[in-house]
Amino acid sequence: MPVITLPDGSKREFAHAVSTLDVAADIGPGLAKACIAGRVNGELKDACDLIETDAELSIITAKDEEGVEILRHSCAHLLGHAIKQMWPETKMAIGPVIDNGFYYDIDLEHKLTQDDIEALEKRMLQLAKTNYDVVKRVVSWQEARDTFAARGEEYKIAILDENISKDATPALYHHEEYTDMCRGPHVPNMRFCQHFKLMSIAGAYWRGNSENKMLQRIYGTAWADKKALSTHLTRLEEAAKRDHRKIGKQLDLYHMQEEAPGMVFWHNDGWSIFLELERFIRRKLNQYTYQEVKGPLMMDRVLWERSGHWDKYSEAMFTTSSENREYAIKPMNCPGHVQIFNQGLKSYRDLPLRMAEFGCCHRNEPSGSLHGLMRVRGFTQDDAHIFCTDDQVQEEVSACIQMVYDTYSTFGFENIVVKLSTRPEKRIGDDAMWDRAEEALKQALRANNIEFTLLPGEGAFYGPKIEFTLHDCLDRAWQCGTVQLDYALPNRLGATYVAEDNSRQTPVMIHRAILGSLERFLGILIEEYAGRFPTWLAPMQVVVMNITDKQADYVQEIVKFFKEQGIRASFDLRNEKIGFKIREHTLRRVPYLLVVGDQEMENKEVAVRTRDGIDLGKMRLEDFATKIHQQISLRSLKLLEE
């Protein structure tokens, strides 16, 4: 007689084993109709799975995040159902859930076209609208293998042979005549899967191994209702307009080419923004009392072996050799910073020691994962490492948190999601050390009134971690900032200080990044602002245009004056109509367009308009310079009089 405890604390007693769907029906027909799955004692289960003992139960509907993920997974099976009807010879590989959607990798000789994708989507909708039940069967490993062998599904057989124990009992999900294998859970009925869209086709190697066969990957998105789907598609359209690769080319900020995959060729205007970002962070370092250092780009393999990176990270490291010595180009800055710390005797009076670097790092990312500035092989980290005592951890972490929020707010990012990853099963140190470390991070977050989500077991083996994920104007999540405690690396690399009692102690090391990769953060900013950078960041802040040749000398005097004032300015003296010039510089997203005619020259004025077409009227040159200086010094996100 199981007793089911619901989230509100109420209890329901049943005379026999019940499913989540049974419990939902006992509560009411509306909930039964909405029920997708259940969370039983913290574990997601299919709505049909029986609960035989007392349990805590949360009923999952499409209003829950887990419910949407489940219906996305079921849409992947629906896609498989439709594919097998249209191309029965297809071999199905894997179909997981991804952010905002799903994909399915298939082996099909016929190369799918956009017309095929549209036909597939239509067939999927036809199938879903029949509202058929999804039937789950738990079978033996051998029965599952026999089922897929009879259907010629070689990839499913490979998964069973290579990834699933022979004493396991896999779950088979039957979509009418189509059968798939999955951990689940899945929707009980296809009425939940009617708001989706197939998005694109790409190539993907089986198991991600380039030595294996290339499969076709079909991407889709799925949502709980029509409105959510429409909102997402609108956001995707806006994201396409804001694509940093497209805008980067339009504004001549940077380029990338085949001879240097994942490496950025910065052009003048892009490098101007990069340097402004660097200057901004450098001022923050000074404000928060950091030393700035510079370590070598390349170090001997021996050091990477001592740090542990060679064992755990060597596949992602670029290497070279000279004079019978093997070197690695650094993928991160931390081992180099420990070497700097180790130069000279350190006392407890020297701690905390905050060491920062704009470190040029390289990682051998797979070529298929490279994506503009967002995923590169060569990048610059705004990396810092704080060497401190156990007692100083909370205060130092608190200062890091303040620095993160102070920095993000400058760029207009206010929606920050914070996660705290705690001790994993495999870890160094005793429980007392982890208790102190985790509590210090929690107290630092609470002291700053930061709400956070715990991720139990997700910390690194050498210490707990705080992650900061910012949400942009399209509500996309970008994980940028981290604060990571490290109780291992200082010890491995022999970092010590003399404690107050004259004993030698190992410092705690705090890894801290704010922007993460400057390249990636700049890509985020390009998309956030759609290339319309705030004045302080804009590569060109002012362009001055003449109406006739009579004003040419005066225009050049104005630009010289602006440059002496530290304002990034240029002139346009081309023999073109003023309307043409204005349109061109508006497309270049220059914040301020200044026009000079005879009257402006006579009165030592400029006619000011913004890139948004707002006419700010005539201003004396000095008045405009004062206003724009104030805007730059405040790092305002808005233009004058907006």
Swiss-Prot record:
- Biological role stated in the UniProt entry: Catalyzes the attachment of threonine to tRNA(Thr) in a two-step reaction: L-threonine is first activated by ATP to form Thr-AMP and then transferred to the acceptor end of tRNA(Thr). Also edits incorrectly charged L-seryl-tRNA(Thr).
Instruction: Give the UniProt subcellular location, in the record's own words.
Output: Cytoplasm
Q: Which family does it belong to?
A: Belongs to the class-II aminoacyl-tRNA synthetase family.
What is the cofactor note? Binds 1 zinc ion per subunit.
Cite the binding residues for Zn(2+): C334, H385, H511
* Top EC class, one word: ligase
Cross-referenced InterPro entries: aa-tRNA-synt_IIb, aa-tRNA-synth_II, aa-tRNA-synth_II/BPL/LPL, Anticodon-bd, Anticodon-bd_dom_sf, Beta-grasp_dom_sf, TGS, TGS-like
Cofactors needed by this protein, per the record, are:
Zn(2+)
Species of the source: Shewanella sp. (strain W3-18-1)
| Summary of subunit composition and partner proteins | Homodimer.
Q: What is this protein called?
A: Threonine--tRNA ligase
Q: List the disulfide bonds.
A: none
Give residue ranges for domain TGS.
Answer: 1-61
Q: Where is this region: Catalytic?
A: 243-534
Keywords from the named record: Aminoacyl-tRNA synthetase, ATP-binding, Cytoplasm, Ligase, Metal-binding, Nucleotide-binding, Protein biosynthesis, RNA-binding, tRNA-binding, Zinc
